[in-house]
Amino acid sequence: MAQNLRISEKNTNFATKMKKSSIIVPEGLKRVLLHACCAPCSSAIVEWLCAHEIEPIIFYFNPNIYPQEEYEIRKAESKRHAESLGIQWIDGDGGCQMSVVSSQWSVESQESRVERCYNQAHAEWLEAMHGLENEPERGSRCARCFYYRMLTTAKKAQELGIPYFATTLASSRWKNLEQINAAGERAAEDVGCKMLDVGCKMADVHFWAQNWRKEGLQERRNALLKEYAFYNQQYCGCEFSMHSKS
């Protein structure tokens, strides 16, 4: 992989250490759909995957992020990171972005379309979180938010024919790893064929549950944050986490 060579040249010692990693890789894994919450949290994981000859396809789907300006900054940084390594990057709201609302009188501008897509996606996320607005961080609202994003990621993996998906959320020490893994496992189960689904032709997908905080990846994340001069957010993303920081 071209990006594998590029990464190892940046830091030979760390690449060698990663090769000796004790992280368990599913047998036969060659590609993984990697849900990315942000560029900083993705950086060390992507480097690790490439060092182990696993192709990451980055999927950016985070309708929880508020406000729109913050969302656009984080998305742009994620895309910049992927493009710098020649890695495929998929916009989770790409279908909405590509649609053009036209009439006899006007064609929707790019700026208006971006704003409409963001507002629509965030409103749907808020509806899914209804009733949990006052829950604390790492509580039941976060668990539901993880599942909301993992379900869409699982569906995208199934659509693309990629048998495994994972998430960079599992790299954050501020998040509950058990909640994240439970959300991923449930999402994989919910998109698969059920025992009674006679004639079901949907391909099974699997969640790669992993603690991406181990093996020096947290320290490597911090180093890459400076190396790439990434924007480093100060709160999780949603308005509720933003208020909890104020």
Labelled PLM ranges:
Residues 4, 11-99, 113-193, 201-246:
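Nucleotide-activated chemistry modules centered on ATP-dependent adenylation/adenylyltransferase
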